[in-house]
Amino acid sequence: MMSHSVSLTFPDGSVREFAAGTTGRDVAESISKSLAKKAVAIAISGELRDLSDAVTEGRIEIVTREDKRALELIRHDAAHVMAEAVQELWPGTQVTIGPVIDNGFYYDFAKNEPFTPDDLPVIEKKMREIIARNKPFTKEVWSRDRAKEVFAAKGENYKVELVDAIPEGQDLKIYYQGDWFDLCRGPHMASTGQIGTAFKLMKVAGAYWRGDSNNPMLTRIYGTAWHTQEELDQYLHVLAEAEKRDHRRLGREMDLFHFQEEGPGVVFWHGKGWRIFQSLVAYMRRRLEGDYQEVNAPQVLDKSLWETSGHWGWYRDNMFKVTVAGDDTDDDRVFALKPMNCPGHIQIFKHGLKSYRELPVRLAEFGAVHRYEPSGALHGLMRVRGFTQDDAHIFCTDEQMAAECLKINDLILSVYEDFGFKEIVVKLSTRPEKRVGSDELWDRAEAVMTEVLQTIEEQSEGRIKTGILPGEGAFYGPKFEYTLKDAIGREWQCGTTQVDFNLPERFGAFYIDSESEKRQPVMIHRAICGSMERFLGILLENYAGHMPLWISPLQVVVATITSEADDYGREVAERLRDAGLTVETDFRNEKINYKVREHSVTKVPVIVVCGRREAEERSVNIRRLGSQAQTAMSLDEAVASLSAEAMAPDLKRRSNSRKSV
């Protein structure tokens, strides 16, 4: 028997009955006329739907334009308006697909002559005209045959292909905005006027149809849209800042590294870049002293090991395979460059019998790993194919697991604080659909990590934000993900802590317990920086190249005003080097202001200026990157001050601890 009413639960917990066929707009009007006027969509049990849709049983929310969820609708609708604008301006242009993406939207177009950046202001102007018309979005459901016939008649061949790709039995929705229409799953807001004017078209790019290089090249137009003009302005400001801070540009200006076609996705480190990289490794190495054994596992291993670990089945397409043209015994073997360090560390743990008294065993490695990334995804230091991972694996008992996770957390947070990151978010990623290991093992791991997550939040007294990422765990275990916020508000996921009951079982790893029985250890994967290359890129962008003195690739330049001060300048440089600083000299016959400007471009943090007076007084004049101020002090004071400032945070703590004893 057909139901004649629909039960809806409202955010305040109240439940009301509505007649079948009641729309979202009807429900909004039943609450208040003002709410109905502000409404742009509804959400039924969390799913966004059109206001014009008939409601179904569940929890209902009326979504207004100010709602965070409305931003996706604003961007989606803006993409449709952009497509209409393009076809009004250039009749005959075919529209293909136009999804919402992070911070905006895009649409791909098939046009004889590709769009150029000069076309964007013209399209924007037409979009504002269409939005001002405030035409309603209306939805129709068409048959497959009708849709193909209509789009074919319009010359929209790509739309015909999209219609063919829609599974049988699935509704084929057509959305109108005035006379213009498009194939779309929806939902949309009530009218084009609700989009507002806080949008901007950003750039044009080429894109193959369906992402396949065998298909025609289309023109993609990217745009962004926001609730308010203030939000748009802030976003554009962040983009401008990000461009100024782009680590690829800074890498060139500071002479740190480069990439080239012969080695796609691998870094050519220059002297200064390698110096800063090694400073980062040295710092991390000191932070592990006393707690970890630093090890090194082979770069190339037989595929049988990766088959045992499960990587060959789950990750093979991202691995670099190596075949050996050697003697007969090797001819048929297939090897792979390691994409991860964990299987190698298990082999080290298994080498020799382990007692429960030796646990936890903590193995750390600054391991070079290789993972295939499509060429289009490569992005400077942030996305590479070969990188160094500050990896560690802890082998412990079930009872030690929670304490080890908390110990790792303390180390991770301390490292991030040393590098100047104050805002941290820790999220627990739970089991994905595709995974290895039994549900029982996953239940155990997730229960422990949920408890640890609660402890992290409590111990931080709310300073560390926490959350859950359902289904985002690795295929072999749940994990914590640590996300940093940088100087311009961008978020970077870096550290991970992952409990793994599965890999030790696959490799038959065990220890001897107090009853002389074999027991399987818990394995905890952890990384703090993650990719050292990527973390260095994040640091460069966070500080806009103006690195803290302790990790700056070149800490001081001693520059002379006159050749009469060159001998004194050499003495100053030598004193600073003896104090542990990285120093270069500039005795060229150039004006001092020219020298200062030139070294500022390469982000030298401290310039020590010496002239005739400084040589006579045995003093120096210190200039700082980004400041017009000049500080005069004696040479002894300068050496003491700069050497103290250039000391790494962990070494300062160690020094202060010794002084307090």
Curated annotation (Swiss-Prot):
It is an enzyme of class 6 (ligase). It is found in: Cytoplasm. Residues 1-65 form the TGS domain. The keyword NAD does not apply. Signal peptide: none annotated. It catalyses: tRNA(Thr) + L-threonine + ATP = L-threonyl-tRNA(Thr) + AMP + diphosphate + H(+). Pfam families: HGTP_anticodon (PF03129), TGS (PF02824), tRNA-synt_2b (PF00587), tRNA_SAD (PF07973). Its EC number is 6.1.1.3. Residues 246-548 are annotated as: Catalytic. GO terms for biological process: threonyl-tRNA aminoacylation. Gene3D superfamilies: 3.10.20.30, 3.30.54.20, Anticodon-binding domain (3.40.50.800), Bira Bifunctional Protein, Domain 2 (3.30.930.10), Threonyl-trna Synthetase, Chain A, domain 2 (3.30.980.10). One of its GO terms (cellular component) is cytosol. Its main location: cytoplasm. Binds 1 zinc ion per subunit. Zn(2+) binds at residues 342, 393, 525. InterPro entries: aa-tRNA-synt_IIb, aa-tRNA-synth_II, aa-tRNA-synth_II/BPL/LPL, Anticodon-bd, Anticodon-bd_dom_sf, Beta-grasp_dom_sf, TGS, TGS-like. One of its GO terms (molecular function) is metal ion binding. Keywords: Aminoacyl-tRNA synthetase, ATP-binding, Cytoplasm, Ligase, Metal-binding, Nucleotide-binding, Protein biosynthesis, RNA-binding, tRNA-binding, Zinc. Its cofactor is Zn(2+). Belongs to the class-II aminoacyl-tRNA synthetase family. Catalyzes the attachment of threonine to tRNA(Thr) in a two-step reaction: L-threonine is first activated by ATP to form Thr-AMP and then transferred to the acceptor end of tRNA(Thr). Also edits incorrectly charged L-seryl-tRNA(Thr). PANTHER family: THREONINE--TRNA LIGASE, CHLOROPLASTIC_MITOCHONDRIAL 2, THREONINE-TRNA LIGASE. Homodimer. This is Threonine--tRNA ligase. The lineage of its organism: Bacteria, Pseudomonadati, Pseudomonadota, Alphaproteobacteria, Hyphomicrobiales.
